[in-house]
Amino acid sequence: MFATPLRQLSSLKRSGIAGQEQAQLYEITNKGYGKDAVKVMHINRKGPVHSIQELEVGTHLKLYSNKDYMLGNNSDVVATDSQKNTVYLLAKKHGIESPEKFALILAKHFLSTYAHVEEVHVHVEAYPWQRMTQDVSDNIGKGYCENNCNSRSNGNCQLHNHAFIFTPTAHDYCDVILTRQDPKQTVISGIKGLRVLKTTQSSFVNFVDDEFRTLADQYDRIFSTVVECSWEYSDTESVNFLHAWETVKDIVVRNFAGDPSVGIPSPSVQHTLYLSEKQVLDVLPQVSVVSMTMPNKHYFNFDTKPFQQLVPGENNEVFIPTDKPHGTIYAQLSRKSLKSHL
């Protein structure tokens, strides 16, 4: 990371007691290496109905020895190119059922294959492919089916056997950390990029009123955010990871939007965030802790008062989207007496 070394290597003592004494002044307190952004696509071709998983994988290893750093000895180093090949070979051997299960397969492989590896960290991001749906009636152009049908057919709406559509509503990711000396499997799943907006049923009033305040009470405002949510499992054996991810996403959306007809009041971003986290822990007993971040994406009312001759009356229809600066609200909710890596 430095453009030039602070001292030339030739000026340092390379051997002898003085060099050993200097080395003992310092210790490596954190380390690791790996391969990032390994892209892999797996197609399950069993039967006429195909399924796909496209992932971006990162594998990082921590070795017991420091000799690769301190001595330039690479005898324990599993090359990052070998780690890349491992991703493809294990995808071929085991398939990819979910990001979490594949990450566990990779992490267990590195620990069981290389005795000199102390810890493995696997990060996986899934590309949001969804099975395509089509209206099989003759009414082309008069209606459509949304691509979230849960059954093989729904009236005139039919799920395609082998065609998919990219639907980046939200991104699925996970982190798996396995340590040789710790029997606990750390599995963290997450959602990011879930952008939502509602035009009413949001307020923000009765906050601190002092000499720094200029914002008036907001009794009815636009509420928009880009949700990032992560959760850690205390039980990884009995959980259906794909179902759990969809459940968390549904909980977040429902607590934000409420009933389709009447909505749900949101007195603050904090309260909406808390309700979502609480329901995640209520519904998913395998989850020990959940963390959420909800930046407040502002939409400010355009002031039409100076233009009453052109557009008379009040304005509650035209707003100015403002990305920066923005508020950021976050919280972590845990079951009592449980620790996490979030």
From Swiss-Prot:
Leader peptide range in chain numbering: none
Any Gene Ontology CC annotation: peroxisome
GO biological process: purine nucleobase catabolic process; urate catabolic process
Any one Gene Ontology molecular-function term assigned to this protein's record: urate oxidase activity
One Pfam family it belongs to: Uricase
Pathway of action: Purine metabolism; urate degradation; (S)-allantoin from urate: step 1/3
Domain of life according to the entry: Eukaryota
UniProt activity-regulation remark: Repressed by 20-hydroxyecdysone.
Catalytic site: 35, 80, 298
Family matches, as SUPFAM superfamilies: Tetrahydrobiopterin biosynthesis enzymes-like
Entry keyword set: Oxidoreductase, Peroxisome, Purine metabolism
Residues annotated for urate binding in this entry: 80-81, 204, 221, 269-270, 296
Function: Catalyzes the oxidation of uric acid to 5-hydroxyisourate, which is further processed to form (S)-allantoin.
Family matches, as NCBIfam families: urate_oxi
Listed name of the protein: Uricase
Record organism: Drosophila virilis (Fruit fly)
Lineage: Eukaryota, Metazoa, Ecdysozoa, Arthropoda, Hexapoda
Gene responsible for this protein: Uro
